[in-house]
C-alpha cells in the first residue's frame, strides 16, 4: 500500500528540495538512477520476438521528464548499452542532461526509427505537468512499439495521461502503413497516450497511478538530496500532506501475478530501494475470538433477490457465509433457493421478523417496486451500517425522498455502484445543481464528490476500485480483469456486508477497553478495502488453473473467498 498525492503536493515537495540542492540537477540525477535500475531489469528479461537489436530508445521531451530520461540514458550507455535519444521538444531540451548523455556515448537521432531496432523504449516526454495527447505521427510510432510487444517504461506518468485524474486524451485517426489508401482498414483510430508496461515514479504515487491501466506495473523509488540532512521526497510529501489536512489517499494492488517484472527480474534483490504497490493492511482478523459465538462475531442481514432474480440472493448470501463464521440472515422471497444452497443461513421473508443484525445489505436483484423502496427507507432509519447495491442504487436515483433520507442519515452507509449506476445517480444530482465529476474521467474526484454529498462511503467498482469517505480515499487495482462476470457485484456486496458486520460488532466492544474512545464511521469504513481486496484475490484464484488463467464465474469467486481471506495479510486490531 502506497500513499497517493496530487500534482500540487508533488510540486510543493519538490520545490523544497530544489532549494536545498547542492547541484541544480541533484534530484533529477537521483530519479534517473532509479529509472536506469528499472530499465536494466527490463532489458534483462525475455526479448521481444520482433526485436533484432539490444538498443534502447529515449523519447525526450523539453522539461524535467526529458532530463530524467537523458540522465538515465547516460547511465545505461555507461553500462554498455546502445542508447538513442529522439528529441521531441521542438528545439527545447534539458541542456546539462543532454551534454552528460552525449559525453557517455549516448546517440541523438532525428528521424522516427523502425520499431524493430529497440529492446526497450523509455517515455520521457510529458511528465506530471503535461497536457493533451500525442501527435498522430508520434502516436503511430508508439503504437508500432506496443503492437510489436516492445516494452515501454514511463517516467513518472505515461505521456498523455492526466496525472491528477487518470483521464486519457481522445484517440487520433492515422493512416496505417501497409494498406492501400482506399482499403477499409487503412484509417484507424489509435490511442493518443502511451500505454506503459511499467511506470517508475518517485517519493509517492500520483493519483493517475491509482486508477489508470495505462500506467501498467507501477514502481516507486524514493529520491533524496545530500543537503538539508539528506532530505527525501517521501518525507517532504508527508509534511505537505500534513500541512494541507486533506483526506489521506492510498493505493494498493490486490492480486500479484508471478509473471510481473518485480518477480521475473528479481528487482527487489537488485534494487531494494524500488518498491511495487502491495497490500499491507492493518485490519480485523476474520477468525473468531475465544469469547465469540455465532451472534457476537457480527451478524449480516442480506435483503436481496426476487422471483425474477433469485440467483442474486444466493450469490450475495453465499459470499457472506464464506466470509464470516458468524450468523448470516437472509430476508426476501428467494429463501427456499437460499436455504437449499446454504442450509446454515437463517431466512425469513420480512424485515420485521429478521432478528438482531449488525449490518445490512440491500439491493442485489431485489426489484424497484414500492415494497423495496419501503424496505430501503426502513433500513436508512436504523442505526446499523447499511450497504446499498444494485437495484437499491436505482431506487436512490428514482426517489428524491430516499436521497434526502440518505443525506439525513447519521449511521454508516456504503454505496457500491459500478460506473453506469454511478452516472445515473450523478445525473440526478447534477440536475439539482450538485457538481459531480464524471466517473470515467476522474474516478477519485467522482467518488469523493458523491461521498461528500451523502456523507457516506462510496465504493466505485471496476478493475481499479475507488473507495472514498470524508477523510480518506483508497484505490485498489485488482491485478486482473476476471471480476468482469455476471454476479461478481452480488458476491462483493455480501462479502463487504460480512466485514461491515464484524467491524461494527468488534468496534462496539472497544469502549469496554478504552472508555474514552469515540467511534467514528471511518473506523468501520477502513475495513472495506480489505474486503474488496479479498474479492479481487478470490477472482484471481477462481480463474487460475494448472495451465494458466481461464474464465471464471461468480459462484466460483464466492467459493474462493476462504482461500483469498487466508492469502491476504490480516492482523487483529482488537
UniProtKB/Swiss-Prot annotation:
Domain YjeF C-terminal positions: 277-568
Residues that bind K(+): 65, 123, 159
Name the record gives this protein: Bifunctional NAD(P)H-hydrate repair enzyme Nnr
Keyword ATP-binding: yes
Function summary: Bifunctional enzyme that catalyzes the epimerization of the S- and R-forms of NAD(P)HX and the dehydration of the S-form of NAD(P)HX at the expense of ADP, which is converted to AMP. This allows the repair of both epimers of NAD(P)HX, a damaged form of NAD(P)H that is a result of enzymatic or heat-dependent hydration.
Segments for region (ADP-dependent (S)-NAD(P)H-hydrate dehydratase): 277-574
Keywords: ATP-binding, Isomerase, Lyase, Metal-binding, Multifunctional enzyme, NAD, NADP, Nucleotide-binding, Potassium
Lineage: Bacteria, Bacillati, Actinomycetota, Actinomycetes, Mycobacteriales
Record flagged with keyword Nucleotide-binding: yes
Annotated ADP binding sites: 461-465, 480-489
Protein source organism: Corynebacterium glutamicum (strain ATCC 13032 / DSM 20300 / JCM 1318 / BCRC 11384 / CCUG 27702 / LMG 3730 / NBRC 12168 / NCIMB 10025 / NRRL B-2784 / 534)
Positions that bind (6S)-NADPHX 1: 156
Reactions this protein catalyses: (6S)-NADHX + ADP = AMP + phosphate + NADH + H(+); (6S)-NADPHX + ADP = AMP + phosphate + NADPH + H(+); (6R)-NADHX = (6S)-NADHX; (6R)-NADPHX = (6S)-NADPHX
Any single GO BP term: nicotinamide nucleotide metabolic process
Residue ranges, annotated region (NADPHX 2): 418-424
Amino acid at each position: 500500500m502506497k500513499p497517493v498525492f496530487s500534482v500540487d503536493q508533488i510540486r510543493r515537495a519538490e520545490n523544497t528540495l530544489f532549494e536545498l540542492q547542492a547541484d541544480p540537477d541533484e534530484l533529477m540525477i537521483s530519479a534517473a538512477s532509479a529509472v536506469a535500475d528499472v530499465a536494466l531489469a527490463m532489458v534483462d528479461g525475455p526479448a521481444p520476438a520482433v526485436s533484432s537489436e539490444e538498443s534502447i530508445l529515449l523519447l525526450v521531451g523539453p522539461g524535467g521528464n526529458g532530463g530524467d530520461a537523458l540522465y538515465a540514458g547516460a547511465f545505461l550507455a555507461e553500462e554498455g548499452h546502445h542508447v538513442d535519444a529522439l528529441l521531441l521538444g521542438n528545439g527545447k531540451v534539458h541542456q546539462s542532461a543532454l551534454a552528460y548523455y552525449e559525453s557517455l556515448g549516448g546517440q541523438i537521432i532525428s528521424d522516427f526509427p523502425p520499431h524493430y531496432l529497440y529492446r526497450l523504449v523509455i517515455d520521457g516526454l510529458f511528465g506530471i505537468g503535461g497536457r493533451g495527447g500525442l501527435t498522430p505521427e508520434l502516436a503511430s510510432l508508439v503504437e508500432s512499439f506496443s503492437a510489436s510487444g516492445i516494452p515501454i517504461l514511463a517516467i513518472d506518468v505515461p505521456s498523455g495521461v492526466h496525472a491528477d485524474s487518470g483521464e486519457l486524451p481522445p484517440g487520433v485517426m492515422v493512416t496505417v502503413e501497409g494498406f492501400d489508401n482506399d482499403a477499409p482498414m487503412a484509417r484507424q483510430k489509435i490511442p493518443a497516450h502511451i500505454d506503459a508496461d511499467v511506470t517508475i515514479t518517485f517519493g509517492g504515487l500520483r493519483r493517475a497511478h491509482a486508477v489508470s491501466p495505462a500506467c501498467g506495473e507501477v514502481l516507486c523509488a524514493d529520491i533524496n538530496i545530500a543537503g538539508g540532512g539528506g532530505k527525501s521526497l517521501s518525507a517532504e510529501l508527508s509534511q505537505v500532506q500534513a500541512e494541507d489536512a486533506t483526506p489521506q489517499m492510498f493505493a494498493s494492488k490486490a492480486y500479484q501475478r508471478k509473471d510481473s517484472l518485480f518477480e521475473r527480474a528479481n528487482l527487489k534483490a537488485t534494487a531494494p530501494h524500488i518498491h511495487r504497490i502491495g497490500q499491507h493492511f492493518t485490519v480485523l482478523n476474520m477468525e473468531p475470538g475465544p469469547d465469540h459465538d455465532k451472534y457476537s462475531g457480527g451478524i449480516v442481514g442480506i435483503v436481496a433477490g426476487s422471483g425474477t432474480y433469485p440467483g442474486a440472493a444466493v450469490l450475495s448470501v453465499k459470499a457472506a457465509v464464506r466470509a464470516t463464521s458468524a450468523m448470516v440472515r437472509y430476508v426476501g422471497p428467494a429463501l427456499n433457493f437460499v436455504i437449499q444452497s446454504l442450509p446454515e443461513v437463517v431466512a425469513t421473508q420480512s424485515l420485521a421478523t429478521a432478528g438482531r443484525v449488525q449490518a445490512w445489505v440491500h439491493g442485489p436483484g431485489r426489484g424497484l417496486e414500492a415494497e423495496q423502496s419501503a424496505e430501503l427507507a426502513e433500513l436508512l432509519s436504523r442505526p446499523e451500517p447499511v450497504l446499498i447495491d444494485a437495484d437499491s442504487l436505482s431506487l436512490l436515483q428514482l426517489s428524491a425522498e430516499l436521497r434526502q433520507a440518505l443525506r439525513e442519515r447519521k449511521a454508516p452507509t456504503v454505496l457500491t455502484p459500478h460506473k453506469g449506476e454511478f452516472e445515473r445517480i450523478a445525473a440526478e444530482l447534477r440536475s439539482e445543481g450538485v457538481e459531480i465529476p464524471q466517473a470515467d474521467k476522474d474516478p477519485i474526484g467522482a467518488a469523493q464528490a458523491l461521498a461528500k454529498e451523502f456523507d457516506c462511503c462510496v465504493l466505485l467498482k471496476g478493475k481499479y476500485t475507488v473507495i472514498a469517505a470524508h477523510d480518506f480515499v483508497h484505490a485498489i487495482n485488482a491485478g486482473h480483469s476476471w471480476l468482469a462476470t455476471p454476479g461478481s457485484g452480488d458476491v462483493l456486496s455480501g462479502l463487504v456486508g460480512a466485514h461491515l458486520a464484524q467491524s461494527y460488532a468488534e468496534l462496539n466492544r472497544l469502549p469496554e477497553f478504552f472508555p474514552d474512545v469515540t467511534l467514528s464511521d471511518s473506523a468501520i469504513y477502513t475495513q472495506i478495502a480489505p474486503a474488496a481486496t479479498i474479492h479481487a484475490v478470490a477472482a484471481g484464484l477462481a480463474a487460475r488453473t494448472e495451465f494458466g488463467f481461464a474464465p471464471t464465474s461468480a459462484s466460483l469467486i464466492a467459493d474462493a473467498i476462504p482461500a483469498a481471506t487466508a492469502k491476504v495479510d490480516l492482523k487483529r486490531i482488537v
